[in-house]
């Protein structure tokens, strides 16, 4: 027989999952910032639409294969937002590096 959880138990479970999601999102964005640093050093643009399309295709395929309560389209929308925030963090880090380069050069 399946375990019946109370609302509070389910909310506690959700809180734990939320904390894990925040931790993983921060790790993901930290990786993106490092990729941005490497792209900056190589003189490459931060925004690379082909890579974004690749990530969203992979995410859509994963969401379809896992077939959870979220549709593949919903998962893609979530990841579009995650990617936007990662790109913003990359730009901010790049601007800080540029300011540091200017200050060091003076």
Model-derived regions, located:
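Domain-level signature for soluble enzymes in the chorismate/prephenate branch of the shikimate pathway
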Residues: 1-106
